[in-house]
UniProtKB/Swiss-Prot annotation:
Pfam families linked to this entry: Peptidase_M48 (PF01435), TPR_19 (PF14559), TPR_8 (PF13181)
Swiss-Prot/TrEMBL keywords: Hydrolase, Metal-binding, Metalloprotease, Periplasm, Protease, Repeat, Signal, TPR repeat, Zinc
Cofactor: how and how many bound: Binds 1 zinc ion per subunit.
Protein name: Putative beta-barrel assembly-enhancing protease
Biological function: Functions both as a chaperone and a metalloprotease. Maintains the integrity of the outer membrane by promoting either the assembly or the elimination of outer membrane proteins, depending on their folding state.
Species of origin: Vibrio cholerae serotype O1 (strain ATCC 39315 / El Tor Inaba N16961)
EC numbers, comma separated: 3.4.-.-
Gene Ontology terms: cellular component: membrane; periplasmic space
One GO molecular-function entry: zinc ion binding
Length: 484
């Protein structure tokens, strides 16, 4: 299924720790961060700030809401987390549409990857090395420790810094000014602390990488290539601004990687499928440029990875509505790997365009028997039902899906559309309210739920449910505003 990000990108690149997202219906405890005496951040406080940051990011940055890519980076990220030490909280991995090379982590369990990383990482191990580095920032609580270090210099720093980061997401000029003002007078200490954090994240990241079965040398290899490529650049990529690569850091990472046995890993097809999907849809290049890239790569890529080239070309043809070119490519790919979620997602879109949604439904039902409740398959299945005007069935599936995945905007968008087309105006408004809440647009969320409440029978269970949600949203709004 095809989804496109919206909004412009504010590049807030903070290499730091992360913790788990708060479920949207859970009560939020207001942290005691604003006091002058506060000099430490608890895990609970980090969770609250992280949830707030993520809601603002969804509103102000082009977060990629692509089910297939989300599944890929989530699986890869959690494979690494399973091998990391000192993991005390869940992780959430997401992507931002930006050709710049960067990744960052922040409060709340969130690790962000720029889509540009896939254009520069030459293997899954190299991508995993960046993710392992960010995971280490999380497990070692570098952002919290950095703020605590500042608090020892100025007692008000934690409250000011945490609030200014939220402002930076909402209004970059105000936030950056607030950060600069807060940290004035202690810059050199912060620089030294940041360098120490980077080396520590490298050390823990390489250990995680090796333990998870990836090539530990991928990290120094990626570092070396970046340093060589941008050594004399007047405008280096954001990653080199937030993650400086002095020679001693590269040398240190190389020496640490040598402590692990060298690995010769076969290229991983799913990584190259994800890369092809990004080039076709999220690289900011036109169709001709994408097809040219695939044509050049086809001549030099390993035979086992040729399916990624065919897949990438099929996506371009699909987006160009050249279905006669896309169909034979996707049909062959599905024949070779009938359970591959990249292929099933694309061929479902193709069958919808060809007015053959029943074929997509049959394929997805078969796949769901193998992996029930899978996010990629469920979202595509609901969409296929929707395109066949099977609104009641789609709503039933999406209600369960949004209950289990309350932070997935894709589910709420489809649920809103299904209810709208069925004429369930109140439920349509409620789903739209959840989308607004996920984007920190509290006033709009409350407005939609208020309208929903006014549409249903006075005193009904539906009205009670809507009114209870309004109360929750009002509390969340006030607590969110108090963090700024």
């Amino acid at each position: 299924m095809k989804f496109f990000p919206t909004r412009t990108l504010l590049c807030l690149c903070i290499a730091a720790p992360c913790l788990p997202a708060i479920a949207q219906n859970d009560p939020i405890e207001l942290p005691d961060i604003g006091t002058v005496a506060g000099s430490t951040l608890t895990i609970d406080q980090e969770l609250i700030y992280g949830d707030a940051y993520m809601r603002m990011l969804r509103n102000n940055q082009p977060v990629i809401n692509d089910p297939v890519l989300n599944e890929y980076i989530d699986n890869l990220g959690h494979r690494l987390v399973a091998s990391a030490n000192d993991v005390k909280t869940p992780f959430t991995f997401f992507m931002i549409r930006d050709r710049n090379i960067n990744a960052f982590a922040f409060f709340g369990g969130y690790v962000a990857l720029h889509s540009g990383l896939f254009l520069h990482a030459q293997s899954e191990s190299e991508l995993a090395s960046v993710m392992a580095h960010e995971i280490a920032h999380v497990t070692q609580r570098h952002l919290a420790r950095s703020m605590e270090e500042q608090a020892r210099r100025s007692p008000a720093t934690i409250a000011a810094l945490a609030g200014s980061l939220l402002l930076a997401i909402a209004a970059p000029e105000a936030g950056i000014a607030a950060i600069n003002a807060t940290m004035a007078g202690s810059i050199q200490g912060q620089i030294n602390y940041t360098r120490s954090n980077e080396k520590e994240a490298d050390r823990f990241g390489i250990a995680t990488l090796a333990k998870a079965g990836f090539d530990a040398n991928a990290m120094p290899q990626f570092f070396t290539r970046l340093a060589d490529e941008y050594r004399y650049a007047s405008k280096p990529p954001p990653m080199l601004l937030t993650h400086p690569l002095p020679e001693d850091r590269i040398t240190d990472s190389r020496e640490r990687a040598r402590q692990y046995p060298p690995l010769k890993l076969a290229p991983h097809l799913d990584y190259h499928l994800a890369r092809a999907r990004i080039i076709a849809r999220y690289a900011g290049i036109d169709a001709d440029a994408a097809l040219d890239w695939f044509a050049r790569s086809e001549k030099k890529i390993d035979a086992t990875l040729q399916p990624s080239i065919q897949y990438g070309k099929a996506l371009v043809y699909l987006d160009l509505k050249q279905f006669d070119k896309a169909e034979p490519l996707l049909t062959q790919l599905v024949k070779e790997q009938p359970d591959n979620h990249f292929y099933l997602d694309a061929i479902s879109d193709l069958y919808i365009e060809l007015k053959q949604a029943d074929k997509a439904q049959s394929l997805l039902e078969k796949a769901l028997k193998q992996t029930p409740n899978n996010s990629v398959l469920t979202i595509n299945y609901a969409n296929v039902l929707l395109k066949q005007d099977k609104f009641t069935d789609a709503i039933r599936i999406l209600q369960r899906y949004t209950h289990d995945n309350p932070n997935d905007i894709n589910g709420w968008q489809l649920l809103s559309e299904a209810n709208s087309r069925l004429g369930n105006s109140a439920e349509d408004l409620a789903a739209r309210g959840e989308i607004m809440a996920l984007q920190a647009n509290w006033n709009k969320a409350i407005q939609f739920y208020t309208q929903a409440s006014q549409l249903v029978e006075l005193g009904s269970l539906a009205q009670a449910r809507y009114d209870a949600r309004i109360d929750q949203l009002m509390v969340q709004r006030e607590r969110f505003l108090s963090l700024q």
